[in-house]
From Swiss-Prot:
Name of encoding gene: hemL
Matching HAMAP family: HemL_aminotrans_3
Organism superkingdom: Bacteria
Enzyme class, first EC level, given as a word: isomerase
Record's protein name: Glutamate-1-semialdehyde 2,1-aminomutase
Organism: Synechocystis sp. (strain ATCC 27184 / PCC 6803 / Kazusa)
Cofactor entry: pyridoxal 5'-phosphate
Length: 433
């Protein structure tokens, strides 16, 4: 066990109780409230490497990684050092900074689809902007998204969405005008025939298809062989754009993202998480002729006070430099596969039906026999059993995402010893379920 002392969360309970009078649900993002797993949310105090400490002094091995950005580990000394130097020059300029050029060149060099890039402040903002760009470039209004894929909380995307919407069991969200979502068409993930049928019904009105190339917001779901290739062919056939939401997969499943890993080049890509090194960031980019539509070069307006923030750019640059070191992704592949194989074996030995998988530093397990190919399959998972598993792991010093419907994220800071320790704890917890 990571925690050698009794699991006490008195301070977390006090802080969370006060927070509920100050913020809706006591949190700044819904999944943090532990609604789907029950129990007391943990209030963090500090992070380092693969470990986190809460305000009560409990220590955990972390597999959330701030929901993806901490691929090099928390508070990496090189990132912290670079940020301290940048901080001495100021926190925000609201004007061009040299760091934007450096990070932009790194992104363009790495991601096959990106010839030009625009920095924003979050993945949601990137997806909102790329939605407008899709429609501006094509002159069409409708889009296709996939059930369970999450692209932020913009109105047009809150249709059969994943992430917190899946966690809370919400079909959509109040406050979204019905007219807004009429132009959003949905299909099951991994179902090319359903996508083709939508194009046949709407041959001249679909601006594009947007998806997570590897789903991480309905749990972890890989694309079937030929699925991404089929989408590329269909979008070309009907004159629509293909958009990969790589906010989660970008620079995580490979240095060039899922598109480099699978060899499929979309027209546009959204990024976030890793490229900010733990600071708020987002980006969207693609072919130069499409990006030329974006103001001030073109007529499609999009702006942001803190976009291209020098601190976020600095953290992103240093993070990508670390990831460029030889062997980084081979190591991430190795430890993540070791983790998932160990978890699945532990579950099977204890008599539980669990399935799962991984790709580089991204993984997931479902409390279901599987296979899980889409959102409907994911919803068959035993969320009550997952909640008990989550609590058992938490009390023994392992911090997993507090939802069955979220992927997990190991980092370069995780050691094989920590992976093996996690598997040993899981064996203990599975035996109690």
């Amino acid at each position: 066990m990571v925690n050698a002392t009794p699991f006490i969360t008195t301070k977390s309970e006090e802080i969370f109780a006060a927070a509920q009078h100050l913020m809706p649900g006591g949190v700044s993002s819904p999944v943090r409230a532990f609604k789907s797993v029950g129990g007391q949310p943990i209030v963090f105090d500090r992070v380092e490497g693969a470990q986190i400490w809460d305000v009560d002094g409990n220590q955990y091995i972390d597999y959330v990684g701030t929901w993806g950005p901490a691929i090099c580990g928390h508070a990496h000394p090189d990132v912290i050092s670079a940020l301290k130097q940048a901080l001495d020059k100021g926190t925000s300029f609201g004007a061009p900074c040299a760091q934007e050029n450096v990070l932009a060149e790194m992104v363009i060099d790495a991601v096959p689809s990106i010839e030009m890039v625009r920095f924003v402040n979050s993945g949601t903002e990137a997806c909102m902007s790329v939605l407008r760009l899709m429609r501006a470039f094509t002159g069409r209004e409708k889009i296709i998204k996939f059930e369970g894929c999450y692209h932020g909380h913009a109105d047009m995307f809150l249709v059969k969405a994943g992430s917190g919407v899946a966690t809370l069991g919400l079909p959509d969200s109040p406050g979204v005008p019905s007219n807004t979502t009429k132009a959003t068409l949905t299909a099951p993930y991994n179902d090319l025939e359903a996508v083709k049928a939508l194009f046949v019904e709407n041959p001249d009105s679909i601006a594009g298809v947007i998806l997570e190339p590897v789903v991480g917001n309905a749990g972890f779901i890989l694309p079937d062989a030929g699925f991404l290739e089929g989408l590329r062919e269909l979008t070309k056939e009907y004159g629509a754009l293909l958009v990969f939401d790589e906010v989660m997969t970008g620079f995580r499943v490979s240095y060039g993202g899922a598109q480099a890993r699978f060899g499929i080049t979309p027209d546009l890509t959204t990024l976030g998480k890793v490229i900010g090194g733990g600071l708020p960031v987002g980006a969207y980019g693609g072919r130069e002729e499409i990006m030329a539509m974006v103001a001030p070069a073109g007529p499609m307006y999009q702006a942001g006070t803190l976009s291209g923030n020098p601190l976020a750019m600095t953290a992103g640059i240093k993070t990508l430099e670390i990831l460029q070191k030889p062997g980084s992704y081979e190591y991430l592949d190795k430890i993540t596969k070791r983790l998932v194989d160990g978890l699945l074996a532990a579950a099977q030995d204890a008599g539980h039906e669990v399935c799962g998988g991984s790709i580089s530093a991204m993984f997931g397990i479902f409390f279901a026999p599987g296979p899980v190919r889409n959102y409907e399959d994911a919803k068959l998972a035993d969320t009550n059993k997952f909640a008990r598993f989550h609590r058992g792991m938490l009390e023994r010093g392992i911090y997993l995402a507090p939802s069955q419907y979220e992927a997990g994220f190991p980092s370069l800071a995780h050691t094989q010893e920590q992976i093996d320790q996690t598997i040993a704890v899981a064996k203990e917890v599975f035996a109690t379920l």
